[in-house]
Amino acid sequence: MRRYLIVDDNRDFAENLAEILRDGGDEVAIAENGQEALALARKTRFDALLTDMRMPLMGGAELVHELRRIDPGAAAMVITAHVADDALEAARREGLLAVLPKPVAVPRILDLLAAARRDGLVAVVEDDSRMSDNLCEALRGRGFAAVTAASVTETERLGPVEPFCALVDLRVPGGADGDALRRLRERFPGLPVIVVTGTHEVPPVPHQGYFTKPFDTAELLSAVERLHRERGQTVVPE
């Protein structure tokens, strides 16, 4: 059984979706705005949040931001008719599993909720935008959300997130090789790291796996899934 939080001021939509989920054996709470949702999140540990973006009192982007402070492990998905909304970009930086443009088919929502992984946030540090996008898409396909950084400086600007692991290219702009990894480790002590490198030399830093470009994405995802299963058990040398 899983617990979901649905936040939408369209009560009929929320009730219909909740009924389908409950029929499948899951627990569902409904809120009509972000403030109501946060009150529920303070009392209950949810596996995933599904929220509209534009609602009275508190919208979806602010809700995701505040939820990360209360329960950073909950997966978060957004439904919106305004995919170019500036506030949506802020929410993306805090690790969304999906952004679903309205109208969205209910089966698509159900599939995403079923796949969503609690404590499933991955930090991706890669300056090649195409590779970063491909990695994030592949991670989402396995139920993982991602936050990204393309430079050493950007690793310092990640939102109030708690990734369970990181995929890190050792050579990104803004510092010497390995600086981005060191900054991540300073911010997230003990964070398991999989190194993605363009050289065939074993990285001279503590890591839980390394992949040389070009690599087999399926093998990389298997390594991420292993770390997710073992989260909380892995002891990482500092």
Curated annotation (Swiss-Prot):
Name the record gives this protein: Response regulator receiver protein Anae109_2439
Response regulatory domain sequence ranges: 3-117, 121-228
PTM per Swiss-Prot/TrEMBL: Is diphosphorylated by GchK.
Keywords: Phosphoprotein, Repeat, Two-component regulatory system
Lineage: Bacteria, Pseudomonadati, Myxococcota, Myxococcia, Myxococcales
InterPro entries for this protein: Bact_response_regulator (IPR050595), CheY-like_superfamily (IPR011006), Sig_transdc_resp-reg_receiver (IPR001789)
Biological processes, Gene Ontology terms: phosphorelay signal transduction system
SUPFAM superfamilies for the chain: CheY-like
Top-level taxonomic group: Bacteria
